[in-house]
Amino acid sequence: MKPRILIAIHYMHLGGAEISLIGMLQALDPNKVDIDLFVYSHEGELMKLIPEYVNVLPEIPAYKMFERPMKEVLKKGHLSVLFARMKAKMRMKSYLKKKQTIDQSAIMGFLGEEMSKVVPDINPSVEYDLAISFLTPHNFVRDHVRAKKKICWIHTDYTRIDVNAELELPVWDSFDYVASISPDVTKTFLQIFPSLTPKIIEIENILSSTFVRHRAEEFEVDWSKIGGGNCLRILSIGRFSEQKNFDNLPFICSLLIEEMKKLLSIGRFCEAKNYDSVPDITRRIIESGCNIKWYIIGFGSDESLIRQKIAEAGMQEHVIILGKKSNPYPYIKACDIYVQPSRYEGKSVTVREAQMLCKPVVVTNYPTASSQIKDGIDGVIVPMDNENCAKGLAEFILDTEKQQHIIEYLRTHDYGNVEEVEKIYSLIK
């Protein structure tokens, strides 16, 4: 009989953790393991990418209410969930007052503890060989899954968020293993939880170069038809004749569009990704003499803030929010430079995907940047403050020789790592 694995995650919206989960599912061999996937709420663009051999467990209503609006929770009669979430919010309010902070990161710890008291077990008739909690809070897999071994994942830089270590340590410590996605993520995590050192196992985000390249070919992106108006409007009047040369206008316009550099960023619209700084950075780049448009794919709570910053900077023609895209890879393929302007990261999935598509990558110097980018070799690291970030980006935009050097390097290196799945197999031998 094959070993049986359960993996739990909130939903399958477009995000780094969710994309890396798809990579893991695609890498796992159905001839070696049986896989059950428990998605709290069956929503998100990536649901359709779950391989057919993965058994997606039915939704459990109480778990589906984990992140739904409180009015919806009440309307659907989940009173125990409602009270658990209210209690978590009250505990969080008291915690913030005591710590004198406004950082809401610790809320997941309170939500996990309170909701775990009221939700039912997950597929209780089965004892799994391995249970994987892919996103915090990890309480649900700890308390409501029967398994011989359990492992939970770290996806971010824990020194950049507020952590209630006293509350969270017992949860992390209850697992057999704690999976970290990079050495730098391990280092920052152990600064908060040094006693967990023996439990750490490093498993990078699993990504397939073949999959990314295949998806990038699904359609062509026509930038001339995408938002933001035009930087230059041209009018010609005359008879449609050979003398007027109007038949060459499409070619001439294509040359004008090519002169404008297309920057792209992908990710959730949240404080960590720093997209609220993009309009000011863009303004500074344009003032330096570069003609650019910066496109952003994603969604999230900071969208209104980003749009406000775009208006304040007068960058409506140059910073274009594209929203959610179920397949962002053709956009990566079609851009000139991929930019990750984050305040902090674990190990960016989209940076590696851009490298797989041989795109020059620029990242800000967040603490874990050097674990992913060899500065000047397979990408460029620029300062995080807006002024120097813009300066570094502008210099790179103008340095086509350096861009080409990086592209050539990327073409000769494979950034896929499906072999990482062997580390998961080793846990169930």
Show the residue positions of the predicted features.
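Short hydrophobic beta-strand element within catalytic cores of glycosyltransferases
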Residues: 360-364
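Aromatic "clamp/platform" in nucleotide-sugar-dependent glycosyltransferases that forms part
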Residues: 324, 343
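Donor nucleotide-sugar binding/catalytic pocket of nucleotide-sugar-dependent glycosyltransferases
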Residues: 149-155, 159, 174-217
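Short acidic/histidine- and often glycine-rich active-site loop of Leloir-type glycosyltransferases
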Residues: 353, 366-376, 380-381
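Conserved acidic donor-binding segment of nucleotide-sugar-dependent glycosyltransferases
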Residues: 375-376, 380-387, 395-400
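Acidic anion/phosphate-binding donor-loop and adjacent secondary structure
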Residues: 162-164, 190, 206-230, 241-244
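Nucleotide-activated donor-binding/catalytic signature segment of Leloir-type glycosyltransferases, i.e.
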Residues: 56-57, 258-260, 307-323
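A short, well-ordered alpha-helix in the C-terminal region of glycosyltransferases
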Residues: 402-417, 423
